[in-house]
Amino acid sequence: MEDFPISHSHTRHFTTWLSDHRCLLVVSSYNTHHIFTLSVDPKTFEITNWKTHVNRSMGIHYSPATQNLIFSNVGNLMIYKDKGELDHPQFGKFENNFIPQFAYFSGDVDVHDVCESSTGEIYYISALFSCVCQPSKNGSFKPYWRPPWIDKYAAEDRCHLNGMCLVDDVPRYVTSTCTGNSMGAWRHSGQQGKGVVYDIVENKIVCDNLKNPHSPRWYRDKLWIMESGTGYFGYVDLEKCSFVKCAFLPTFLRGLDFIDNYAVITGSHPRHDPAFKELLIGKEIEDRGLDPMCGIWILNIDTYDIEHQLMFNEPVKELYDIAVVPNANRGRILELSDQSLLNLFYIEKNKN
């Protein structure tokens, strides 16, 4: 895709919210092959946009414990570090600058959600191989877990395993579009209402009959998820094994993070892939007299009110994930091709 300006509109107090919470919003857009970094310029009180070319960017995760920003592109898992304040010759000072530190070549295993423990253990979903993986120094990836309905590791995207979250520093909950065990089974007719949330530790399904569940996140002792096929954000009642719908958003939901008492949610225009033709979200939006949107929503998890939103304009149509970087302002991600990286030197402190 040719270069393009980032164009968006937002509600009146979106900038105030972003400034008050002093955070960066890092969003992956795989249809434009970019990651967008949104923050507030303290001088102008306007939103600063920075876009970084990342080929088919999907899962993205920020760990406050390690200060790693981890994201996927086609064939790689990238680990970036925040190196603090740097000046840009054209755009001035950026307080937070993420530069490349490591890369793991995995091949195109269709990385979806990515997580990191507080001790630096990295886990990710390979939708292609229907499993939870870890980076490997000796292979494309190291399998960590696969669903009990999948009988072997095969590059067949059988059930479209997509989402994952950690609890107590280990992978605990995953989301899957169905429980099929054949090549592309999730794409077959009748599978879109058979999504599940699975507890890896307890080895059981904790919620089923979901329409394309996505983005499980453990926050404030609740398991939050999004049902992309219906447009509902909510949580799983683990005692009743049911999905509690909390708020409807006119978008194809994917991408969720939290800060304070807010859920920060991303969504895309409804999918036109034949595999998603049975989903209700498009009709639900139409029946409500709404327009489908691609953007970011700020939702209060105490009241379930949507308090702020930012909508992207063309050509941004699809987002996958979002990471909230706290205690940060006016940030950017430097591209591997950025020549300034050749003259940035950081000496690790000797612990002795």
Regions flagged by a language model, labelled:
Residues 1-352:
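Sequence-structural signature of mature extracellular/luminal beta-sheet repeat domains
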